[in-house]
Structures are given as C-alpha cells and as structure tokens.
Amino acid sequence: LCIFLFSVASQSIFSNTIELETLIRNDEGKLAIVVDSSDPNISNLARRAFALHGGIVVTEELVEALFFVKIEPAGDSSALLTLGSGQPYTEQLRRTVSGRDLQNAVLRACDMVVKATLQSEGFFAGRLAFVCKQNGFSELYTSDLLFTRISPLTADRALITGPKWSPDGRSLLFTSYFKSGFPDIYRIDVDSRRKTPIATFKGLNSGGTFS
C-alpha cells in the first residue's frame, strides 16, 4: 500500500516556477481545438495533456474547433508545432520546440498553444514534487505532470513533509526526521540529488520556504 501525500508545485516551461490562477469555466466556455500528428504517441500525449486543462476541450470535428493544432517529431528532443484557424485555414504559429526529450518537447509545445490561444501560462511541461508514504516510511519524488516518469529523490526511510520548490525550479526545501528523529529542514538539488541541511536546531524545524 502506497499513500501519496501531495504538496505539489509545478515548474514552468522556463526555469522559474509559476503561480497559476484559479480558472473556472463552464463547458460552453471552453476553447475547442483539434489535435493532429502523424505519430499516434504524440497525438495521445497531447490529448492527455489538454484534457487536464479546464479551459480547453479537444474535439474530433474540425468545423467545431476554433484552432487546429499539429505537432510532429523534429528530432530526438524537439517537436514542430503549427497552429492555425479559420476557413480557409490560416497558419498563425510555426515553431520548433526543444525539450529534455521528445515527450518534454511535446508538452512544451502544448504549453505554447495555451499561451497563444488563451494568453495564460501553460503547465503541462512542469514537474511535480510529492511525498509517497509506504510501509511507515516516506520518500520524496518528482514526476512529470502525467506521472509517466517518476523519480525518487530520497531513500532515507524517514518521515518527510512539505516539499517546496525553489524559485528557479532546481531544488526543493523539505522537512525530514532523518538522522535525529526530530524535524529538520533540508535542501536537495533535483538533478544531483545532493542533500544539504538548512536548519537542524534543537526543537522543531519545519515549514521551510524560499523567500
């Protein structure tokens, strides 16, 4: 049994974390788009991403869509995005989007669609930080938004709470009962997984956040 305790932050398609405003829409207020690709994996990935957005709905009928989105592979870690609308069709955006890999590039392209059509920041290419508690122990993990690539950051077999992203999205602050058995604050580099103690004073150290 694995219990997920989420303290989730998203990393933007750029280096900095972003704050997303609450957006509530009725179905009739959603932006209808058509998504196409010669690669079925890319098409499915883009559709899964857009399905998470409250302001966009993917339709199969071109006549019902305000925009036509086409995403094609352009290398191992890049995708070609074209965006257009109208009858007759008019191309409005063409961009080669690079990423850490092809999947990340496709999600970044989806973020560009959100920015171009809704004038708001996308979040599909972000990374999530969360705590998973299993067998009485909790560890810190990161994942892409669709949970297709989950990576452990710690293996301490200790209670962990409250991960917080740094402003540049490269590290996390969290509270851990590692070593002392009492709550201490640590900072961990997401790429190297190097952990640094920040606050290990006597008493309770918790709730660390970046200012």
Residues of each region from the PLM?
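Residue-level detector of Asp-centered blade-edge/turn motifs that repeat once per structural unit
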Residues: 120-124, 167-168
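Residue position within the beta-strands of beta-propeller blades
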Residues: 127-132, 171-175
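A flexible loop/linker signature enriched in serine peptidases of the S9 family
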Residues: 121, 132-140, 157, 176-184, ...
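Conserved beta-propeller blade repeats
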Residues: 116, 157-175, 195-196, 200-211
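Short loop/turn segments that connect beta-strands within beta-propeller blades
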Residues: 144-148, 189-193
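Amphipathic beta-strand/beta-sheet edge segments enriched in Tyr/Trp
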Residues: 47, 63-112
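Conserved blade-register residue in beta-propeller folds
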Residues: 83, 141-142, 187
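A structural "domain/chain start" motif
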Residues: 12-48
